[in-house]
Amino acid sequence: MAETTSLAFPNMFNLTSNQVAVSEDIASVVERTRLLILTEPTELYNNPDFGVGLKRHMWKYNSTNERALIKDRIIEQLRLHERAVFPDRTQFTDGLLSSSDVPGEIEDPNSIKMTAVLQTTFGKEISLTLNQDAPVEGTLTINSSGWTVTQNL
């Protein structure tokens, strides 16, 4: 039996079996977290409390204040809407976990690179990487159990 289930996102309908598609366990948590992070407030369900709202940070410089605002907003949204994650155990790193830091590399003030590691209630970890290289373009990469989901912002 699955620990948690939800409607599959973004493909909510399984056309071959003429049913609503359902995700289970880690895929369910990944899809719900992805939906939560990529949604702007009032964009879905017309709820002002649902969604991290990353677009408001797109034209701002990569300062410690901006990173702190994004981190706080992600934790706040997980606390409100994601029951399968321990929000207080979320760990953030500035930069990408998979790349090594090159000494002397100048940080670009127009890019945000942040990785969050979430602990689920059933003992798995999810790694979320926000990589916004330019003010116009950005991607959210979600790594979990060997597969990666990338979404353009």
What are the language-model segments listed below?
Residues 1-76, 87-153:
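Immediate N-terminus of the mature polypeptide
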